[in-house]
Amino acid sequence: MARNLCRNVQTTPRPLTALSLRRMVTPFHDLELQGSHCPRPRYFGSSTAKSAKKKSNNKAYSGSSMSAGDASAGPSRYPPLPEGWQAVIGIECHVQIKDKHKLFSTAELPTPSTPPNTLVTAFDAAHPGTLPTLNRSALRLAARTALSLNCQIHAESRFDRKHYFYSDLPAGYQITQKYMPLANNGQIKLLFDEGHLPSPEDEITVEIEQLQLEQDTAKSSYFDIGTTFRLDQASLADASNAEASPGAILHETDDDRVDRSFVDLNRAGAALMEIVSGPQMRTPEQAGAYVRKLQQLVRRIGASDGNMQEGSLRCDVNVSVNRIGEPFGTRCEVKNLNSVRFMMNAISFESHRQVKLLQQNGRVEQETRGYNESDGTTFRLRGKEDAPDYRYMPDPNLPPILLSEQQLHELRHGLPELPDARRARLVEQYGLSSRDINVLMRVGSEDERDGRIATQSLDTHAQQQTSSDAVDYFEQVATGRSAQTALNWIIHELMKGLNARNLPFKEWYLPAEYLGQLIDLVEDGQVTGTTAKTVIADLLSSAQSGHDGKTCLSLAAVRALAQSSSSPVFDLLKQRGLLALNTKKDLMPLVESAMERLPDEVAQVRKGNLKVAMRIVGQVMKDANGRANAKLVHQTILEQLGPTSAP
């Protein structure tokens, strides 16, 4: 009966207004929150979201970026444990699946700019009578992830209910996979050449104990005592009023000074993968390398964007210490770490804290701890005696997931080239160094800053291009060209320009075809390297600010020429008078002008001081705006000042 209900009943309610959502959910919380230590929830709108001050709590997720310096290999910056001691580290990663809809409802996933409580169905808000319908697309992405982790995918897996009460869980339980998960017994290899480990001796293989599907919770925001709010009366208009605000707009007030908790249900029910590692890691660097490689992998297969600063990838870390050769010690869990750097800091502090406690004849208690970002310390949240009894039980509204060998075969053959295989091929095919490969493969592993781009200034073609894979881009540019030359232009000019403008790596800023044409012009001597660098800077600036090409070079101008020309970059540079001056006839007016303005240098060159000729060359290059061939300019100057002076 339950199976038929799950397959036949579709939950397609329209998104709820703020008023109906409050009426629906508030009684549920009021029943339990009388006299409870849990903050009372409020459902809020976008104006409050912007002004909210987050409180450090084990249910609050805040974003943080990974700096480029964190990703560099080198000596460990974390102090080692005292001799004879070791840390044992396991990590639970919660990875939000990158799909259009949530795991069991038709609501779409929010973006960072989505107003609170506007992408919520009745099922997401736990309205009585609604039933779940499994998102098959999310299931496929989870299965692809399991295959890429070399996991064993079970032919049959089931969903369970994990019961606990908190304001960000309207139903009072989370749908997860406790007893029969989707997959287990996988592994990830951490290699020194990937650039995250201090030495080759740190290379390990980390086991993947389990990969399971589950729902995400709502997003909570917390306010300190002294910050209170009142509802705007306009937002309390009748729910049928089309002009009513989609979220309750709150304003600060001076009365009723209490702690407040505000809940945004947009994220509630989003599809998550919980990926549980084995306890093979021993150092913060190994833990950081593990999370970064997992992040790289889920991005490569399209399962998640893995942005820790936006909550798409969150980590809980289990840390214990013991003397080498003795049984593992009592573990402590550090919850909700939202950046790799914070996670590594937390592991280092927690392992040293436990060793110091044991050396002083103390006892490590099994407990859940939080991380203080301001001083890099961990703090107690609750002990084992306070841990909730989740009372897992099979979910009666969901049938088992059945996957055939044929389905798994199709998923396996649909996987893209995975990072390890890709790395090996780049070395063999192009002869790239590990350092160069790391630069290409790490593009996009830091902050994605798409939200900062003025997309209204980009043309339709640009908005349709969303590729951010630097390796694919490199291979397109390198086709028919020197791989090292292509790499140098990408890393030292294109990426440098993107970083200077605070832009993410997206191909449509400078399509590979156009960069390739520009490189060819430089190699053929038709454009100088100086001019080419200026061209790249102009193209990036035009893409960022929306120039139409009248005052500087623009991609729109290149694409317009591409409709009638096979070499639009050459044609545009020719139109703008930016081609190199490659003949003595073109250079003579500039050379003569420079010699007239530098008579002292001319006299010294004629006396045999040939080094001074470079001053004249510099003046010519300046007058030519970098378009002159410096070698030909030097030769022309020496010829003009007398054949006896020529080398």
From Swiss-Prot:
It catalyses: L-glutamyl-tRNA(Gln) + L-glutamine + ATP + H2O = L-glutaminyl-tRNA(Gln) + L-glutamate + ADP + phosphate + H(+). This is Glutamyl-tRNA(Gln) amidotransferase subunit B, mitochondrial. Its EC number is 6.3.5.-. PANTHER family: GLUTAMYL-TRNA GLN AMIDOTRANSFERASE SUBUNIT B MITOCHONDRIAL AND PROKARYOTIC PET112-RELATED, GLUTAMYL-TRNA(GLN) AMIDOTRANSFERASE SUBUNIT B, MITOCHONDRIAL. It comes from Mycosarcoma maydis. Allows the formation of correctly charged Gln-tRNA(Gln) through the transamidation of misacylated Glu-tRNA(Gln) in the mitochondria. The reaction takes place in the presence of glutamine and ATP through an activated gamma-phospho-Glu-tRNA(Gln). Subunit of the heterotrimeric GatCAB amidotransferase (AdT) complex, composed of A, B and C subunits. Gene3D superfamilies: 1.10.10.410. One of its GO terms (molecular function) is ATP binding. HAMAP family: GatB (MF_00121). Keywords: ATP-binding, Ligase, Mitochondrion, Nucleotide-binding, Protein biosynthesis, Transit peptide. Pfam families: GatB_N, GatB_Yqey. Residues 1-16 form a transit peptide. SMART domains: GatB_Yqey. Belongs to the GatB/GatE family. GatB subfamily. It is found in: Mitochondrion. GO terms for biological process: glutaminyl-tRNAGln biosynthesis via transamidation; mitochondrial translation. It is an enzyme of class 6 (ligase). One of its GO terms (cellular component) is glutamyl-tRNA(Gln) amidotransferase complex. Residues 39-77 are annotated as: Disordered. PROSITE patterns: GATB. Residues 58-76 have a biased composition (Low complexity). It comes from the Eukaryota.
